[in-house]
Amino acid sequence: MKIIITEQQKKTITNKSDWKEGNSKLTKTFYFKDYKEVMPFVNSVMKIADKQNHHPDMTVHYDNVKLSITDHDKGGVSEKCHKFVNAVDKL
């Protein structure tokens, strides 16, 4: 069952933070100068994920990190996902 988020939530995600919705998940790539900037970001995301008990898929490269988040229990994007992306965007 795919969870539908409200149009307002979609506008917030799309317009303010560049998260893309597709395949029942939210995805965003964050770009950095180099690996020394990447790893502190990854550690900060890990802390958010542990605190919220909602863990993204992360792909780490030399100068970027791709995050994808979905709610496996709900079968798609949920309010938990929305809360997670808002917290990450505050980093």
Q: PLM features: what roles do these ranges have?
A:
Residues 23, 60-64:
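Short Gly/Ser/Thr- and Asp/Glu-enriched loop/turn motifs at secondary-structure junctions
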Residues 43-44, 86:
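Solvent-exposed alpha-helix faces
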Residues 52-59, 86-91:
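A short N-terminal helical cap/helix-turn-helix that marks the beginning
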Residues 1-21:
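Short acidic N-proximal helix/loop "leader" segments that mark the beginning
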